[in-house]
UniProtKB/Swiss-Prot annotation:
Monomer. Binds 30S ribosomal subunits, but not 50S ribosomal subunits or 70S ribosomes. Gene3D superfamilies: 3.30.300.20. This is Ribosome-binding factor A. GO terms for molecular function: ribosomal small subunit binding. It comes from Lactobacillus delbrueckii subsp. bulgaricus (strain ATCC 11842 / DSM 20081 / BCRC 10696 / JCM 1002 / NBRC 13953 / NCIMB 11778 / NCTC 12712 / WDCM 00102 / Lb 14). InterPro entries: KH_dom-like_a/b, RbfA, RbfA_dom_sf, Ribosome-bd_factorA_CS.
Length: 120
């Protein structure tokens, strides 16, 4: 059963990525990238994790509002492309791992710069 769940999550991720690029014209979601999907055991809910290229708080709120507005359309189009009995309800959550990774990159760059300053 776990293998099927993984396949379904991967297929939902691929289809949602296609849908947001081709069918959703809202400029608020133009910088959104879906990173992962986790489905409930009965496939009634799908938590979709997304990231943004910007760390601007206003852009994050706008992207969240855009995703919520497009949720119904995305679910409808997802239902047309998937061969499932029931299309899962979509729940969008911000993926914090991208922010965490960029923070670590900045810290490492700062450490490297400090090390170079000490040597000079």
């Amino acid at each position: 059963m776990k293998h099927r769940k993984g396949r379904v999550e991967g297929e939902i991720l691929r289809e949602l990525t296609k849908i947001i690029r081709k069918n959703i014209r809202d400029p608020r979601v133009s910088n959104v990238t879906f990173t992962a999907v986790e489905c409930s055991n009965d496939f009634s809910y799908a938590t979709v994790y997304y990231s943004l290229l910007t760390e601007d708080e206003q852009a994050q709120k706008e992207a969240e509002a855009g995703l919520e507005k497009a949720k119904g359309t995305m679910r409808h189009l997802l239902g047309q492309s998937l061969t499932m009995y029931k299309v899962p309800e979509l729940i969008f959550k911000r993926d914090q791992s991208v922010i965490y990774g960029s923070k670590i990159d900045r810290l490492l760059a700062d450490l490297k710069k400090q090390e170079q300053d000490r040597q000079n």
